[in-house]
Design a protein with these regions (language model features):
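Extracytoplasmic
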Residues: 11-43, 68
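Helical-face signature of the major facilitator-like transporter fold
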Residues: 16, 20, 24, 92, ...
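Small-residue-rich segments within alpha-helical transmembrane domains of MFS-like 12-TM solute carriers
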Residues: 24, 28, 96, 112-120
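Residue-level signature of mid-helix packing/kink "hotspots" within the transmembrane helices
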Residues: 28, 57-66, 116
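Extracellular/periplasmic helix-loop-helix junction of adjacent transmembrane segments
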Residues: 33-62
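Helix-breaking motifs and short loop linkers at transmembrane-helix boundaries and internal kinks
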Residues: 42, 76, 97-103, 114, ...
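Conserved MFS/SLC helix-loop-helix module at the cytosolic interface between two early adjacent transmembrane helices
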Residues: 62-102
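Cytoplasmic helix-loop-helix junction between adjacent transmembrane helices
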Residues: 109-136
Length: 136
């Protein structure tokens, strides 16, 4: 078995920044695409119902917070983050392939559930590694 090497502080910061960015990407990549998304999911031009895609994403994030904390305590940070990122990828792929509004909303909910693992594990890993002024 290969010996585990210590991660440099730069690698840890880059990793935490990446998983933090993935949470924002789920929202920021969607907002400018609303006009293009509407016809793809069967909504009329100018329909405000498309904004539910953001609302449902946040609902998924909120629901996931309740689940991932105990899962991380029981199974560990890395397996929980891997599970969450797999769910994130599933939701993002479903959102990309959605051809009706209901499927888009379901995919966005799944995407939000996955994103909540990234959000929660980002803070949890930070707290595990650093204390006090080192966290800033």
């Amino acid at each position: 078995m290969a010996a585990r090497r210590e991660r440099t502080e730069w690698e840890v910061v880059a990793f935490l920044a990446f998983i933090g960015m993935s949470v924002a990407f789920g929202i920021d990549a969607t907002l400018p695409a609303f006009d293009e998304m509407r016809p793809d999911v069967g909504l009329p031009p100018g329909s405000n119902r498309i904004t539910l895609a953001v609302t449902v994403y946040f609902l998924g994030m909120a629901a996931g917070q309740v689940v991932y904390g105990p899962v991380a305590d029981r199974f560990g940070r890395a397996p929980t983050l891997r599970l969450g990122m797999a769910i994130y990828a599933l939701g993002a792929t479903g959102s990309m392939l959605a051809t009706d509004f209901g499927f888009l909303l379901a995919s966005r909910l799944v995407w939000g559930l996955g994103a909540s693992a990234a959000s929660l594990m980002n803070l949890t890993i930070l707290r595990d590694l650093y204390t006090g002024d080192r966290m800033a």
